[in-house]
Amino acid sequence: ISFPVMQTKDNQFYLNHTVSKEYNDRGSIFLDANANGQFQDDNSIIYGHSVEGGGMFTLLKNYCDEDFFKSHPVFYLLTPDVNYKCHVFTFAKTTEDSVFYTTSFGDY
């Protein structure tokens, strides 16, 4: 997956707009509006469509296959300031009302 990650104050905008802000049903990949933008939150949620033909997040479905999961344990998130090496430790299909969408956690 090699797309820019957009962000705006309205999570609905990039659901159907391109990086150049033109209307498009496929939209863009974007960071949750409540995130700080530097990927330093406890949980940074990135949204994107799974589209026909393998674009955007469609390839993430491959993580449902255990062999693929084991053979692709790392991905890189590149930002203008920092390049992150990320380790995949779990994969789950979920719905928009799932607990996985929690972005703020209390002190424990």
Predicted regions and their residues:
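Solvent-exposed, non-transmembrane regions of membrane-associated and secreted proteins
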Residues: 1-108
